[in-house]
């Protein structure tokens, strides 16, 4: 795909995968807006040290806030939705936070995309939705298993994305990365 001049939004742009994607879209000529989670320090996560920092339009907001999403998507054509609470262990202590960000946040992204007539939503899920492998290699027919509040929240987000595609014909693609690693990863 030719990204030159494409108006894209990346949610979760300050994180591990989101920061790399944001940089690559800029390198490919995309008109890239990056949504980073608001914080009192005004930092942009991994984008603070990005070599293309000055070529990115950064907006602070929160996917769990509908108005943030409507503003962030204004004038965009494609959204890459990577914003999420991650980390399985903490999800056992704060499951409501995971539902709020991962499920309700995804709902806000999808509703804003629909209201702004976006061309496409690329929704980022996780291999964790499959739980313990029932067979290998795992494929898309593998049963979904919510083995933690985190994985259950991502299953919920995936199903809402699917519903928006089937109910409203919103062009949605769901990707489920496995074992991502590299510079900037969290440990």
Each language-model region and where it sits:
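N-terminal Rossmann-like NAD(P)+-binding domain of SDR-like oxidoreductases, especially those catalyzing
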Residues: 1-183
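ATP-dependent carboxylate-amine ligase catalytic core
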Residues: 187
